[in-house]
Swiss-Prot record:
The keyword Signal applies. Residues 583-594 have a biased composition (Acidic residues). The lineage of its organism: Eukaryota, Fungi, Dikarya, Ascomycota, Pezizomycotina. It is a single-pass type I membrane protein. Residues 477-507, 566-638 are annotated as: Disordered. This is Pheromone-processing carboxypeptidase KEX1. It comes from the Eukaryota. Belongs to the peptidase S10 family. It comes from Ajellomyces dermatitidis (strain ER-3 / ATCC MYA-2586) (Blastomyces dermatitidis).
Length: 638
């Protein structure tokens, strides 16, 4: 090796050493922590005109060892009635995304067929901040290392409390809000467990020393999977009542045989499998199979509808066909700050999560409710009348058997039960209320498994009553909501002057007024043209008569005194009527301009070939194998 080569080699060796040292030092430097600003969503594809609801979204790591990350989507309240409130919403499954709640139920926007966003009349963000969370890990936009799924409720709870602590570190100004948890279906297991953990956390000296207690004020659970025993045994009575199965038929005998197998499991003293019992799950499957005719079957989430067999409700609600492609567009995932580590596109429910979450060592959440109520925590349970999978009869039977605060069920005193009070909303019979000792039950008539999807305004009225919103000091037009004939606290559901929906209605009124003015101006123009035509006709008629009387005189047009200029009068009039670019009225009221969408609209795609925004294929585990089979077997209680 020559001198120059040796020197070059030595120089490279020194440089390599320095590079190694620099990289090592860089690894020792702390990674810059994210701030709230990193999660700010400044725009969304397809957003409606006007200001966007203030929102933040993204991932928070809750388990570095397994790369476990929760996805959240937070919407700030539109107005504060008397004090700040935050509602955490969870969907069920297990393994179903809370974007269902955000975009089909209580959130401020819903996705249209052309993937635009429309404001929801009755959304829950009017007087409360909304926090939607995809959990357990692997649900929706949340993700985790393969095989590291959650299987028990205690583990789920621990991860969720970790998430809340980290979320409040990012957004400390919300930590002292009145805090509520709401959700539906299998969230009936999640929510009581999380509530118990929060109350226990608040008692810790370390938490109290830092003044970091969370102001948990209440729980709302819709069509909840809370007491599996009561729910399993309610399926056939509900099917009889609704005419799904006829008594004394071969179909009823087949269902009763399945119930007998379930009862053997329920009567065995066993500390495992009390939340998910395969033999008992078969009851619902058998009922649904008995409705199979042709290629259709009953929709287990809304018995008024049917679905393709063997989905039997899995394709419902209809908005789902709009949401999945919308949440897979690249510009949407970028707007929501979806990490690149999330390899697969959004799916509503994860078969892998549901298949692992059996909770075989967990006790049903119904066993937690009495103590929560006795500690003074208000709880509201509500049910849609036309839901089969988590039907209202199971919830009502559970309440009737539950003991707390010295009474059973809705007892006011021994043998005296709280009455069911009829509820009317805006003149319609909406359902009934029943209340006693911190527990409220609401039945919604003609509603499905997802009550807010059917009745956003009614559920908002229910919410405002429960959390204590009273618009008396705010002003506005109160909603006509009566329980037992009495109005109670005044709620607005978008009727107060500063509400978002009121502003939207005012905008529609202004647009309608503009169109009326346009049509009115058109009518006036038509009258003017008609009068001009009559005058024209009179002049023509008189000119012809004059020519007939004086054949020696040449016809010189309408204006005989103007000479040759008369020949240009009609063309100029015609040109005025046929104007385009110079027509101020036409420019102001061009229908195509009024119907024009914002330029950021996401266009629907007719085929995979024209979908450049897709960010990944569906998770195979969600569509086939055990996970898919469990969805067909109706495990998912979203």
């Amino acid at each position: 090796m020559g001198f120059s080569e040796t020197r070059a080699y030595s120089a490279w060796g020194a440089w390599s050493t320095w590079l190694t040292i620099c990289l090592a030092l860089a690894n020792l430097l702390p990674v810059t922590a994210k701030s709230a600003a990193d999660y700010f969503v400044d725009s969304l594809p397809g957003q409606p005109e006007g200001p966007l609801v203030k929102m933040h979204a993204g991932h928070i790591e809750i388990n570095p060892e397994t790369s476990g990350n929760f996805f959240f989507w937070h919407f700030a309240n539109s107005h504060i009635a008397d004090k700040p409130r935050t509602i955490v919403w969870l969907n069920g499954g297990p393994g179903c995304s809370s974007e269902d709640g955000a975009l089909m139920e209580i959130g401020p926007y819903r996705v249209t067929d052309d993937h635009m966003l429309n404001r929801t009349d009755g959304s829950w963000d009017e007087f409360a901040n909304l926090l939607f969370v995809d959990q357990p890990v692997g649900t929706g936009f949340s993700y985790v290392s393969t095989g590291a799924y959650v299987s028990e409720l205690d583990e789920m709870t621990s991860q969720f409390v970790t998430f809340m602590e980290k979320w409040f570190e990012l957004f400390p100004h919300y930590e002292k809000d009145d805090l509520y948890f709401a959700g539906e279906s299998y969230a009936g297991q999640y929510i009581p467990y999380i509530a118990r953990a929060i109350l226990d956390r608040n008692k810790k000296e370390s938490v109290q020393a830092q003044n970091r207690q969370w102001n948990l004020k209440g729980l709302l659970i819709g069509n909840g999977w809370i007491s599996p025993r009561h729910q399993y045994l309610s399926y056939l009575p509900y099917a009889y009542r609704e005419g799904i199965i006829q008594g004394g038929t071969d179909a009823s005998l087949r269902v009763e045989a399945t119930i007998s197998k379930c009862m053997k499991k329920l009567n065995v003293e066993d500390t495992t499998g009390t939340i998910h019992i395969a033999d008992c799950e078969d009851i619902l499957q058998t009922i649904v199979d008995e409705t199979h005719k042709g290629n259709r079957c009953i929709n287990m989430y809304d018995i008024r509808l049917t679905d393709a067999y063997s989905a039997c409700g899995m394709n419902w609600p209809p908005d789902l066909k709009n949401i999945e492609p919308y949440l897979r567009y690249k510009n949407v995932t970028e707007a929501l700050h979806i990490n690149s580590d999330k390899q697969t596109g959004w799916t509503e429910c994860s078969g892998a999560v549901g298949g692992n979450f059996r909770a075989l060592k967990s006790k049903p959440s119904v066993e937690l409710l009495p103590r929560l109520l006795e500690e003074g925590l208000p709880i509201l349970l509500f049910s849609g009348q036309k839901d089969l999978i988590c039907n209202h009869m199971g919830t009502e039977d559970m309440i009737k058997d539950m003991k707390w605060s010295g009474g059973t069920g809705f007892e006011l005193s021994p043998g005296v039960w709280a009455p069911r009070q009829d509820w009317t909303f805006e003149g319609d019979s909406a359902g009934f209320y029943q209340q006693a000792r911190n527990l409220t039950y609401v039945l919604f008539y003609n509603a499905s498994h997802m009550v807010p999807f059917d009745y956003p305004r009614r559920t908002r009225d229910m919410l405002d009553k429960f959390i204590g919103v009273d618009i008396t000091d705010i002003g506005g037009n109160p909603a006509d909501s009566r329980i037992g004939g009495e109005k109670g606290p005044t709620t607005s559901v978008g009727g107060h002057p500063n509400s978002t929906t009121a502003a939207e209605r005012e905008k529609e009124k202004m647009k309608s007024a503009a169109w009326k003015a346009y049509y009115k101006s058109g009518e006036v123009a038509l009258i003017v043209v008609a009068i001009a035509a009559i005058i024209w006709g009179v002049f023509i008629w008189r000119s012809r008569r004059q020519k007939l009387r004086n054949p020696s005189h040449e016809y010189r047009g309408i204006y005989p005194m103007l000479g040759s200029s008369s020949s240009g009068s009609l063309p100029r009039f015609s040109n005025k009527r046929g104007r385009s670019a110079d027509d101020v009225e036409a420019a102001d009221f061009d229908e195509t301009e009024l119907d024009e969408r914002p330029s950021r609209a996401v266009s629907s795609r007719s085929s995979r070939e024209h979908e450049p925004y897709a960010i990944g294929e569906e998770d195979g585990s969600d569509r086939e194998g055990e996970g898919s089979d469990e969805r067909r077997r109706l495990v998912d209680k979203s």
